[in-house]
Amino acid sequence: MTSAASEWPLANTQHGMLVAFGEFLKQHGLIDGLMRVPVPQRTRQFAPQTKLVEFLAGIMSGIEHLEDLNDGPRPLVKDPVVAQAWGQIGFAHYSSVSRTLETCTDETVAAVEQAINEFSRPFVASVVHDLLRRGEALVYDFDLTGQAVSSTSTTYPGVAFGWMNDRIKLGYQLARVCLSPQPQERLWLAGFHHPGDTVSATCLRELVHAAEAQTQVRPRRRTELVQQRIEAQQEVVTRTQRLVRQHAEKLDRLHQTQTTLIGKIYHTEALQKGAIPSGKMAHLKTQVAGWRKRLPRLATQITTAARVLAKHQARLHEQEAALVELQAWHAQLEADNRTNPDPPTYVEARMDAGFVSGEHLTWLLEMGYCPNTKAPNDRTTTALRTRLSTKTRWVPVGANADMTAWGNYFLHGCPFPLTVALERFKVGRAYKYATLIYYRDEGVFPTLPVWFHHYNERQTIEAGNKEMKGTFFVQHLMSRSPAGIRLQVLFTGLAANAVRGCVPWLQRCAPKPTPKLTRALNSPKQLVHVAANAAALVQRTLCGTALQFAPDSPFPGVTLFLAGVPAFQLALGFNQPYEFASG
């Protein structure tokens, strides 16, 4: 390779780092996986799978709109070197890519997701293994972010009005979960697309199940908590069964009384037809009149008793069904534990208040997670403020924040004791309040300052959402087909992970990194918007591929030796490029 500007030949690509991205993904088997995805479209000049690969390459080059593939400042379609690095003979016109996205089906999306999972699995396993080896917690961050479209649009499928960016907008909601191994570090695990009126709490279970599927790790299920609910439910069922018996016996007595009265009336009226003394006749008539007067009241009592009995029977049926459901849930969690002999000691679910309800907290706790979240509404905060007194001890946790905490607090809808902390923030001369919620099995809790700062580290996922929008433009929907929209979500998460995941490999591929390159490697946005759109010369030999950035690029003279990264390696053998032989 050459480094002197006077000796520099013409660059043969305008997307230097994108070539490296393609080599990385190709050598790890992702491109081959995408080329096997079923797409119900005939091959003309380019296979439909090629257009999916092109779509991913475009996202990793930072295109803002699909037409940028052709009409952007550095058209990807006109760069055959990039296409070759991504294992293709060339790239198609963006309109052809658009038609392919419209043709994709649920089967296509599922196959793409499977290919991405196979690519991601060793990287996720490496991070998880490292955390568990060091005895550190697994922390999952959950979030819901809006994808707004024009309020007058009628062509986006499944849109709905919902709360997005502090106002009501038309669009979609994107539910995501990431693993946060360290502050400011994240590994996206899954994302789901929903109509705009979807709320966070309804997405929690699918995100938890997706996180477990990706990491292949799950906490010990707390079957003892489910057993507590079973025992409580059995007591409820027993009480209702007693009520049902009591009301059934009462109804039987009323029916028996009614039958007896009718019999007496019939018998007495039969006696009146015979020859009896006038005094006795008058007495019998008085008795019959009293019995007949009592019958309507008795019928009303029977109707009321039957209605009350039916109500208790219906309640008993619901309670018995709930008990059966709890017993099945207990059996399922026990089965989970039998196949999970060495669970991690602590797995945290960190989320904002939108994901929280009594029902979902109960489910999380029984699933073995330790929630770290905020109270779902102001009622909890208001209730806690009534506990304050002049003797309350406030602990400073930040420059403008204090906290005080209570244990064994029961939130509405959750039968298990939680630890809660009241936060106060001074704004002007007044205070504003909020409530944090936490749970740990062993009862050993962090100090309030540690808790405060650890919860606020969930800004990691919020920063990730901003990166999705500012680096990969996920908010600009590049297709109006359901499958195309879901593919954009999948490819955006993949791109964010891959750009970060390939950094150690790129560092080893650059024998003489410059300060500018080092800064770029620490900034996904610079890698995508600057390095992946920088002119370079790519040369291929029998030994491998070498890439040198142009003298007038942001990284003049930087050379990357892109030697083969094996598609499958042990966890401790990642990012080891082969060395070029000299001579």
Segments from the language model and where they lie:
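Conserved oxyanion/phosphate-binding beta-strand-loop segments in alpha/beta enzyme cores
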Residues: 11-34
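Anion-binding and metal-coordination hotspots
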Residues: 1-12, 32-583
